Amino acid sequence: LALLGCQATATEPAKAKPAAKPQAPSIPIHQAAYKGSADVIRQHLAAGTPVDTTNQYGSTPLHYAARSGKADAAKLLIASRAKVNLKDSKEITPLHLAASGGHTKVVALLLANGADYKITCGERKEPALFAAVNKNRAKVVALLLSKGADVNAKDAFAETALDSAVGKGLPEMVALLAKNGAKVNGGGGTSPLHKAASTGQKEIVEILIANKAKVNITIAFGDTPLDWANRNGKKDIAAILKKHGGKTGEELESGN
């Protein structure tokens, strides 16, 4: 029998402690993305770090994974709903960074997940094709063209990727672009052949002529590529042009 004045009490179950919220790692998520540290990225995301968080440069983790060519990190970020077409403070997208770096696998991954190769970036408003051409990334150029990138797209200065390749002295890139439909006679203004002739780029001159560039194409004031070669003292280029029927503007005007 229970003692007078005492009551039997049931033992109350202990309350479960709430699970501790995961803590973000000390390594910044942008650094983890650049190094391809997938586990660190996962820890950040589990701790609530936004997948598209930006740093002082306006860059997201995906920008950094694209820049360094870390495909696994890029894949994880994209699977976590990273926006593939965001621009950083310099107006650059992850696709441009991957294309410039020659990271074909990351370029393919971005394109497969909605990256837009038509978006223009930087001061010159260049599409992704230019980023690859400027760094002589032939495999990336071929991939972009195979996915529908316009080989004759123009930047803010009305120049094409072919103009850029000629300007940077990249004969193999000139050949690749010409093979894929680049307009070898240009679209107004200075022609690619004028540029190559005036700067003494023998191999590029020969490639352009082999791809049906007009030897006697004229621009402002009736100047031909031969005029520009002569004016800049490029005797070897002048000889090549003459071999293919090249004439000066004056000769064309006089009918000689």
Where are these regions (language model features)?
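Bacterial N-terminal signal peptides
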Residues: 1-3
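Leucine-rich solenoid repeat scaffolds
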Residues: 218-256
